[in-house]
Swiss-Prot record:
Enzyme Commission number(s) of this protein: 2.5.1.-
The reaction(s) this protein catalyses: carboxy-S-adenosyl-L-methionine + 5-hydroxyuridine(34) in tRNA = 5-carboxymethoxyuridine(34) in tRNA + S-adenosyl-L-homocysteine + H(+)
Keyword Transferase belongs to the record: yes
Domain of life, source organism: Bacteria
Gene: cmoB
Residues reported to bind carboxy-S-adenosyl-L-methionine: K91, W105, K110, G130, D152, P153, S154, M181, E182, M197, Y201, R316
Keyword field: Transferase, tRNA processing
The protein's name in its UniProt record: tRNA U34 carboxymethyltransferase
Subunit structure: Homotetramer.
Similarity field: Belongs to the class I-like SAM-binding methyltransferase superfamily. CmoB family.
Job description of the protein: Catalyzes carboxymethyl transfer from carboxy-S-adenosyl-L-methionine (Cx-SAM) to 5-hydroxyuridine (ho5U) to form 5-carboxymethoxyuridine (cmo5U) at position 34 in tRNAs.
GO biological process, one term: tRNA wobble uridine modification
EC top class named in words: transferase
GO molecular function: methyltransferase activity; transferase activity, transferring alkyl or aryl (other than methyl) groups
Amino acid sequence: MIDYTSFLEQEKEGPLARWVEILPDQISEGLSTKRYGDLEQWLTAMQNLPQVDNVQVSYQSAVTLKSTAPLAQETHTLIEQQFRALIPWRKGPYNIFDIEIDTEWHSDWKWDRVLPHLAPLKHRKILDVGCGNGYHCWRMYGEGASQVIGIDPSPRFVVQFYMLKHFIGSNAPVDLLPVPMEAVPANLQAFDTTFSMGVLYHRRSPMDHLRELKATLRPGGQLVLETLVIEGKLGEVLVPEGRYAMMNNVWFLPSVPTLISWLTKCGFKNARCVDVNQTSTDEQRSTEWMTFQSLSDFLDPNDPTLTAEGHPAPLRAVILAEAPE
């Protein structure tokens, strides 16, 4: 089992104290082998990982782990087998002792689009909502964040994260909690920066999600919001009646002006769009480490500007805004 004891002990006196009181039960529910039938075998894969001394870590495009001494072939093979047991790997890339994990998403490309626009992350306490396996959490730490907490309710992603942290070391102030956004106490106001990337369109009530995000931020803290949008004017929103790009849990795709107005309505200040990008089949695709269908399968085979259902193909915007002082 993943041990959160030191994290809970460290946070019980700080701004997360209210959350720490209820977190043990939330963690137990999020990592329940009764709820998630495959979780036990994923945890076994993590427990099978060997110890590697003197690991060097680079938090660049591919989060890279290297050993100062060559690994024995059987050790290298064992590590690769355990990481493959957690397929599919969606966010990355990673390079684990020369094992290249070519993930479904080139998440480094998104980071390169987002990073230049952010308030500097150095010394910041950061929350990453819906963080997947935590790739961007490591990139945030690499930019000098004092602490990064990711939350994601998928236990596979949580185990993937802690497989990396097994080698990086428990002293790194980066953690991933197996909880959804709803688990975060109201009006926590504990974080300098909160990221929500690839989450808003999965929410039945986008306004509620935006208000929840604002409540995580200290006064003046920065929100980094990345979500699917459509081209259009103020007030225009796509609400797919069926699936969108083969996903049945997509609810609201606003135009950029509409999204900015939502943020303003929810009390954010200075909401502005800093990037709009058409998702390409080079950025999101099937790989050896994610062998299922991907973006090319979700688009109209005769017109890649449309989804298989005839909606506009995925267009992603990055919006920044601040909580009021």
